[in-house]
Regions:
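Rossmann-fold cofactor-recognition segment
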Residues: 80-95
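C-terminal catalytic/substrate-binding lobe primarily of soluble NAD(P)-dependent oxidoreductases
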Residues: 23-25, 183-413
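Conserved glycine-rich Rossmann-like NAD(P)H-binding loop of the short-chain dehydrogenase/reductase
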Residues: 55-69
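Glycine-/Pro-rich loop/turn segments that contact NAD(P) or position catalytic residues
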Residues: 116-225, 261, 268
Length: 413
């Protein structure tokens, strides 16, 4: 097996070892990708996706706290693909900084699904920046991403690293969907784009816990999600649409503004990429085709947000779904998503769409796995932007092409 040598506390003959720090270039490290959190619901789906898509064609590993649970996942991977007997198993704990340093130093790209990221993400980012390792995650937490930019962008940029958050349904379909749309438009003209989301799927315990924790500090989350107002070179303008809830006759649907991290990510990409034009505006909406569903969703979200403000009711909500649980394979198989973009410049109007299967887990695991593979294998095709970057800035068209080959559709309507 392609495992790391035992560190302190490791026993000869074990498949699970503690990672040892290495000073060699990342391509000479034991692994090209490590999946941290592989025993969780989404992390396991990521590992299973890699087992099916790459097998042992490149060296990769799974990592987490529990040796026993990691061994269980490893056996499942071997059952999917016997080549995965070569997949490494590494013990690491987000609460143990030395173990994270050893883990980050063992791989070219560290993929983490361990959330909530506001609680567990920053130590992993720190280890990656200090050890010279690229990083991807699936967070949708604005405060965490903003803090990552503030604390580590310059250090990561100085080392030529790509620290890329939001590599799942938050926010790849939106961020790369807008990039794909912009590339269909003439250069040098003002651009206005609306993104309209529809989806069907389930909820995992990890996502539920992250959402409740975000609702508990809603003011900070909303503040972190506001786009930057710093002036851009050359007088470029990047702005959020001010359109509120409205009925769209062309789509026969209500368009409800979505206060998620996605528009913040899109606008950050627009600020960093001149190709988005001299004056860029973006609006982000949920597309709801039933008034009853719209009202029911609004009441439900408001109720959960209110209950999240108080410790007793917050703990009750957290107990509804345990971490590590999630929708069944049958539910995931029936899920789907579409994000439709309506774009206009002075000389052209188009509609595009990104679509795929169940968004929260089936496609999220695919998206983040392909993001890690893109960083590990496509470096000669990546945009020049480094630091704490978005998927559009850090991977761009190379990742769009990977996702298309993996079955996620990007198309002009």
């Amino acid at each position: 097996m392609n495992n790391l040598p035992p560190g302190d506390g490791g026993r000869p003959g074990e498949r699970c070892y503690r990672a040892r720090a290495m000073e060699s270039p990342t391509q000479d490290r034991p692994y090209r990708i490590v999946v941290l959190g592989a025993t969780g619901f989404t992390g396991r789906l990521v590992a299973e996706y890699l087992a099916r898509s790459v097998g042992a064609s490149l060296p990769w590993a799974i990592a987490g706290r529990s040796v026993a649970k990691l061994e269980e996942v490893h056996r499942a991977l071997v059952a999917i693909n016997p080549e995965c007997s070569k997949v490494g198993v590494v013990q690491a704990d987000v609460g143990d900084a030395p173990s994270l340093d050893r883990l980050a130093a063992s791989t070219s790209v560290l993929l983490t699904t361990v959330g909530p990221y506001a609680r567990h993400g920053m130590p992993v980012v720190r280890a990656c920046v200090e050890q010279g390792t690229d990083y991807v995650d699936i967070t949708g937490e604005p405060a965490f991403v903003k803090e990552t930019v503030e604390r580590y962008h310059e250090a990561a940029k100085a080392k030529g690293l790509r620290i890329v958050s939001c590599c799942g349904f938050d926010s790849i379909p939106h961020d790369l969907g807008v990039l794909y749309t912009v590339l269909q438009l003439p250069e040098g003209e003002p651009v206005s784009i609306e993104g309209m989301v529809r989806a069907k799927g389930g909820v995992s315990g990890g996502t539920w816990h992250s959402a409740i924790n975000a609702f508990s500090d809603l003011r900070s989350a909303m503040s972190a999600g506001r786009p930057s107002k710093e002036p851009l070179p050359g007088g470029r303008k990047v702005r959020a649409s001010k359109a509120g809830l409205h009925f769209d006759k062309a789509r026969s649907a209500w368009l409800c503004p979505l206060p998620t991290i996605d528009p913040w990510i899109v606008l950050r990409s627009a600020r960093g990429l001149d190709r988005y034009g001299p004056d860029f505006r973006y609006g982000h909406f949920a597309e709801v085709r039933s008034t009853a569903v719209l009202l029911g969703g609004a009441v439900g979200i408001a109720g959960v947000a209110a209950l999240s403000q108080f410790k007793p009711t917050r703990e009750w909500l957290l107990g509804r779904i345990a971490p590590g649980e999630g929708p069944s394979e049958e539910v995931r198989a029936k899920g789907w998503f579409t994000v439709t973009f309506r774009a206009s410049t002075r000389s052209k109007t188009i509609e595009t769409q990104v679509s795929g299967g169940e968004a929260g887990y089936a496609e999220t695991s695919k998206m983040v796995a392909e993001s890690a593979l893109c960083l590990a294998l496509d470096r000669d095709r990546l945009p020049p932007h480094t630091g704490v970057v978005t998927t559009a800035m850090g991977m761009g068209e190379a990742l769009i092409e990977r996702l298309q080959r993996a079955g996620i559709a990007f198309r002009v309507l």
